[in-house]
Amino acid sequence: MLLVSALLLQSATAFSPVSSHVAHGSALPVHRQPSSLAMSTTPTATTQPTDSSDADLAKEPTNEISPSYDSVVVGGGPAGLLSAIMLAQRDSKQKIAVFDRLPAPPSPTDEKVWQQTDRYYLIGLGHRGQKALDRFGVWDEVKAVSAPVVGRKDWQPGAKAEEGVERLAADKPTTTQVLPRDKLVGVLYKHIMDNYADQVELNYEYQVMPTSFGNDADDDSATDDNDAASAVTLTVSKCSPVDGTSTTPTPEAECEVDTYQTVTTEFLIGADGAARGIANAMEEKDVERRSKQNAFQKLFGGIKPFKVKRFEDDNKRVYKTVPVKVPSDWRFDLNYSARSKGSRITFEALPADDQGTYCALLLMKEDDELAQPNSDPKKLRQFFDEEFLQFGPLVDDETMALVAEKPASNLPAFRYAGPRINEGSATVLLGDAIHTVKPYYGLGANTALEDVSVLADSLEESPTLKDGVYSFSDKRAGEANALVTISRNMDRPGKLFLVTFLLPLILDGIFHKLAPFLFAPNMFALFQKEGMSFRYMQARKRFDRVAQLSILGCVFYGMVVAAKSMVKIIAKKLGQSDGMVGAAMVVGAFLLSLAKKALAGGNESKEQKA
């Protein structure tokens, strides 16, 4: 399995509760009900800065939240923070708040934090992500703490250490830059604190839930043309990390949902990723709305339905992370990849810096003996010695024991939201909240950042916020569907893998080489083309597939007709029936095949003896 860009999930380090924000306005009264706790999880965790120079990333909480904001962003990941930067740049008078359930990110320059390379997601930023970051003036800061990847080096199953094949992406217009996800978040955080601290509040360890999406969304008879007021009402609850979970792949947070503050906003962006708190609330709202509609209203009502399409993971893989320091005579800018015999385990390594520090994934099935927690380190060492000869010497016994001991982590399942990604005229979703894919092809984080750029375009092109919200939904809902559908078709198990991935890859290679003016290159090449939408890729490949199968069908039909004609001619010459001649030709072809195999086997035996 090819991994153009792998996400390397962390086992997050301990972090004491931190909430950092610059307060606007007065503190809200706190609403209290009988105490209860809600558990929430997220695949991101952070580490408290250890150097005093990084204190600006860990300001003491003021616990003061304004009763209203111009805009609220739920989710403090890359897409959420870039959304806040985008909004701040659009209007310097905007009062913006960002809320996230986990602590503030570590400093992007704190080397003590980033030395533990196997504790963090690594993401590869391609042309989509780089273009979005550059548009909002943060790319140079991100690039400064990233490592370039200019190609791959692959080892086929059973290959010796010296038999790796190096492939450089010489014709690739954009060089992929790799860095831990949390480091990217840290860069964006610092950029906000340095440039927009008086405008943007960064509130950590808070959970946000909508109670009203505005009058136009809450009105069950509303249509897209409704111009009713659309302020969104939210409840904000304090959270804290759960003791003992800081070293798990998916750290948890306890949120006091019965002790909350109420906030209103004119514009809500849901960028809370896999948590999907806003998306879940939108889905519940849509179910409630549609339950009150008759059949005619459901079919011809003015509002499109909203649903999160959740696919069953029929090709599930889990992984363990392995820190690796490659030798000084190896290149530090390659993705190193190897597969074991039978494709039992795949080894994928990406650079965590430009000094030869790598973080590797061991991808395997969840029932594999080595995927279990507290597995035998001797068996893991033996597996490396037999299958990954080139990497075994790079992992010492202590690290091998730690890898064997820790539990495996899950890759995300495919999901997308649609056919609209707005609720009323004041709420939109973006990022992983609308499209979740496995990290094999580097599309998740990059597309999430691109969403922010498209949202900026939609707002700039529209006379009102409402028009911008609907424009963004129209542009990106279909993209989310296409992205997830394409990615899932490239990750099917068994025979489906042959039909949906391998065979199309072969056909695209053949036909594009024969007629590049008519047939597009394979999907991997299309991913690298700038300015090409996923919906276009999907439609283009459907056209290619119909044309390819039509041509193959015509060729096959012509071969059958030609064979029948040949049989008739030979039968007429010999005075035999068509069936007799046809059977003789089939038997002859079969015997010729056997003779060819026997001859090849004999030559191989002679070579072995020699």
Region annotations inferred by a language model:
Residues M1-A27:
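N-terminal chloroplast transit peptides
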Residues P61-A79, A97:
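Beta1/beta-strand and adjacent pyrophosphate-binding region of the FAD-binding site
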Residues V73, P78, A84, G270, ...:
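Conserved mid-domain beta->alpha element of the FAD-binding
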Residues A88-D118:
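Glycine-rich FAD pyrophosphate-binding loop
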Residues S107-M193:
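Active-site-adjacent segment of FAD-dependent monooxygenases/related oxidoreductases
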Residues Y204-V232, C239-P241:
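A conserved short coil-to-beta-strand element within the FAD-binding core of flavoproteins
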Residues S240-D243, P249-E254, D258-L411, A417-G418, ...:
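Conserved FAD-binding catalytic core of PHBH/FMO-like flavoproteins
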Residues M400-A401, Y441, D457-A610:
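C-terminal helical "tail/cap" subdomain of flavin- and related membrane-associated enzymes
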